[in-house]
Amino acid sequence: MTERADEEGVRRKLRLIRLLHQTNPYPQGLGTARQRRNRRRRWERRWKQILALADRIYTFPDPPADPPLDQTIQQLQGLTIQTLPDPPTTQRLAETQGSLPAVWVRVDPRSVPGPREGYKRDSYERGEELVGGSGTNRKGDTRSSTKDQAGSRNCPPVRDRDISKETL
């Protein structure tokens, strides 16, 4: 009967603490910056008061003590490390063995591309020149001076007589 009364007392205390927390909602974001800041400060002061009051209403019991160090050491001593088999010495031996331990299975990294097949990440591999490159492309063709870098529209050539002091 005392356990049930203790449980009911704990529940009553926790309900009271929950009610206290519900009576202090976080402030809404209306008003000027100063008004919002002051509301947050007042809310934080009330929140600290509620925490102090809740701590007086119900103090949580201490957690159970850690197991003694001797017991922990004994548990660690009971652990064993399995010895790993030697890795295969040749590639053929590795292929003929049907069941290799997962430790020695060869894994190829995904980021290593093959000899320029299917991997077109760099401008060199795409055959494009970087900005300010030479006047020829990889095929040896010279670029047209009337095309912009995108090569999609024609631009008229600029002559010295078109530029005057007024335009500068």
From Swiss-Prot:
Subcellular location: Host nucleus, Host nucleolus; Host cytoplasm
Keyword Oxidoreductase: no
Region (Homomultimerization): 16-24
Gene Ontology terms: biological process: mRNA transport
Locus of motif Nuclear localization signal and RNA-binding (RRE): 35-49
Record GO terms (molecular function): DNA-binding transcription factor activity; RNA binding
InterPro entries: REV_protein
GO cellular component: host cell cytoplasm; host cell nucleolus
Keyword RNA-binding listed: yes
Biased composition (Basic and acidic residues): 117-129, 158-168
Chief subcellular location: host cell
Motif Nuclear export signal and binding to XPO1 in this chain: 71-82
Region described as Disordered: 108-168
Pfam family, one: REV
Domain of life where this protein originates: Viruses
Keywords, ordered alphabetically: AIDS, Host cytoplasm, Host nucleus, mRNA transport, RNA-binding, Transport
Self-association and partners: Homomultimer; when bound to the RRE. Multimeric assembly is essential for activity.
Function noted in UniProt: Escorts unspliced or incompletely spliced viral pre-mRNAs (late transcripts) out of the nucleus of infected cells. These pre-mRNAs carry a recognition sequence called Rev responsive element (RRE) located in the env gene, that is not present in fully spliced viral mRNAs (early transcripts). This function is essential since most viral proteins are translated from unspliced or partially spliced pre-mRNAs which cannot exit the nucleus by the pathway used by fully processed cellular mRNAs.
UniProt comment concerning the protein's domains: The RNA-binding motif binds to the RRE, a stem-and-loop structure present in incompletely spliced viral pre-mRNAs. This region also contains the NLS which mediates nuclear localization. These overlapping functions prevent Rev bound to RRE from undesirable return to the nucleus. When Rev binds the RRE, the NLS becomes masked while the NES remains accessible.
Protein name, UniProt field: Protein Rev
Species whose genome carries this gene: Human immunodeficiency virus type 2 subtype A (isolate SBLISY) (HIV-2)
